Amino acid sequence: MPPELQIAAEEVTREDLVALLNEDLAREYQAVISYVVYSQTIKGPQYMNVAAELEVHAVEELAHALLIAGQIDYLGGLPLGVPKPVKISSNPKEMLQFDLDAEIETIAHYRKRVRQCEALGEFALAEHIRGILVQEQDHQISLANALGVDTPDASLPIKR
């Protein structure tokens, strides 16, 4: 495992986890907004099925946001309401690439979050995040397929 992805478990507190989950929540809000916008503005007959799939992604991302917000509350924190910035484009390939890049980042963060939850003994939360990861990886695969590219490796070095 790359050193950038290793975690000093003893350094993560519940307060840290709440802050990190709020960052994840901001990414989920970003995903909801981008999928809603892109599903309604992507043009061309080759993108009709893609638009429908993006609508499904929007609903799934909203479910993720609700789950993460509930877990933040459970941990004693306050779920925040500000999304990460949403990239807007009228170019279908750019839209899909923006979403693919965001999914890769989200997957890398959630993989790290699972380990952090387990280090704190928050095993149920880790399982919830694993469930989210399954859908995020499905999104990554469908976006890569829509772009006609191989599914990228989500094991990117990320900052906490």
Residue ranges and their predicted role:
Residues M1-R160:
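Iron-associated oxidoreductase/ferritin-like identity signal
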